[in-house]
């Protein structure tokens, strides 16, 4: 009986660990990175996550490196004359100490154009977030299919 309970416990713990996809380095946490695509053959997708700066220093997000699509960019959405406009970011994004930067719809997000292949729901895709001062955080985006709204 003890062996069965132990096996169930280990199975539960290992599954929880395998489904979690949060990343941390040098007091910077990356929470739940996902790429939303409408269908497997989509050519465009958006990436969302939270970046939490738990350090006592400012950090700047410079770029994203990935072999996911032909082009990947950091974008922001601004409201101009009652119209939302999306545009690529040309500079680094500052994250102050003890602050969180959330990549979400109608805000900062990653855009992926011309994916290198078709994806499956829940597929994990490797990438690297590049910050100033040489900080690089390897992450994995989880592919989320469908038209439903993003919920973190």
What does each model-found stretch correspond to?
Residues 1-4:
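Positively charged n-region of N-terminal signal peptides that target proteins for export
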Residues 7-15:
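Bacterial N-terminal signal peptides
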Residues 21-152:
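Compact, glycine-rich, soluble single-domain proteins
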